[in-house]
Amino acid sequence: ERERRGVLVVVADGMGGSRAGEVASRLAVETVIRVYREGAAGNPLADLYRAVETANQVVHSESVANPEMSGMGTTCTALVVRGGDAYLAHVGDSRAYLMQAGRMRQLTQDHSLVAQLVRDGQLSADQARSDPRRNVVTRSVGVSAHVEIDAQRFEALLREGDTLFMCSDGLHGLVQDEELSDLASEPSLSDGCKRAIV
C-alpha cells in the first residue's frame, strides 16, 4: 500500500479565537489523511488536491454550524512522497522545504500579505520579518466555502540523502532560513528544532 499511495505528511496551523484554531487544524489533518487514503482518483496529486479541498469544506461547515468556531481556519500543507516523486497541496504560510546536496529550497509559496508585498517589490525579506502584518494570511482552509489550492508534482525530485522539511510559521517565523538549513542537516531534526526554539 505504501508503494502505491506513498507517504503522506500534513502540517496545519490553526487560527481563530479560543480553541477554534486547534479544532480547525485537527479537522484539516484528519480529513486530509482520511480522504487521501480513500484515494478515489488513484492519482496522488488529484487525490491530495481533493483531500485539501474536502478539508476546506469540513472546516468551513463546522465554522458555520458552531458559533464558538465562527471564522476559524488553518493553514494546510500536505506532501506525498512516492518513489522519487513528491506531490504537494498547499494553502497558507506553512512551508515545505527540500534539503538536497547541502542546499535548501523552499517548495511552497507563502500565502500571506507580507510575502505578496515582497514578491511585488514593496518590502524586502528583512523588512517582512519584522512587519506587523507578517501574520496576515491571504489564503486559509475553512474561512470560506471555496479556497484556491496550490498543487504541484515534483517529478524525480528526490535522491538518496535528501531531506524534506515541513514547518509552520511558529518555526520559520522565529529563525532565519540559514538556521532552518542547519536544522534540516541535523541528525535528529526534532532535537535541532527544540534547540532553535528555546
Question: Where are the regions a protein language model picked out?
Answer:
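PP2C/PPM-type serine/threonine phosphatase catalytic domain
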Residues: E1-V198
